[in-house]
Amino acid sequence: MKIEVPEEVFGIKKWEAKVKSNYNVASFIKEFVIEIPEEMDYKAGGYIQIEIPECDINYQDMDITSHHKEHPDDPQKFKLEWDNFNLWPLNMKNNETVERAYSMASYPAEGREIMLNVRIATPPWDGKKNDWMSVNPGVASSYIFSKKPGDTVTISGPYGEFFMNESDSEMLY
C-alpha cells in the first residue's frame, strides 16, 4: 500500500496576525488587512481559515468607516445605509471556538500582508415583521467586522486546491 500526502498539507501553519486596517469598501463589505509574522507561500486562489473565539459582538460597536483612499471626503459614507436597514441593534453571540474559510484577495508577492474582502452576514429579513429574523448573524463576518487596527486574530493556512494550470491553453471560468 502506498499513501501519498499532498505537499501543501505540510505547508500549513497557524499564526497570530495583527490587524493593519479594516475599512468598509461598500455598504456591507470590509477590506480586512492583517499582517502575519512571516511570509506565507501561497498561490492565487488559496484561502486561509480564521479562528473565531467565544465572543459577544454588538453591531453598535462596529466601525464602518469608509476606505480613506476610496472616499477621502466622506468617512461615514455607509452609515446612512446601516441606519436605514437598522443594523445597529443586531448582536452576534458565539459560544464556541470555530474556524471559517476565506479566500485571500491579496497577491502572494505582497509578503506578510493578507487581505480578505468580507461581506457581513445579517440574519434573514422577515417581511411580515418588517425586521430581522431572531437568529444569530454570521459568526465570522461579525467577528471580522468588529476588529480594529492593532487587534490580533488567529489564522491558519495556506489551503487550496483550485489553482490555474500552467499551460498555453485558453482558460475559461
What is each of the regions a protein language model found here?
Residues 4-149:
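Ferredoxin-reductase
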Residues 54-57, 157-162:
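Short, charged beta-turn/beta-strand-edge "cap" motif at the junction between a beta-strand
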Residues 153-155:
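Structural and coupling elements of P-loop NTPases
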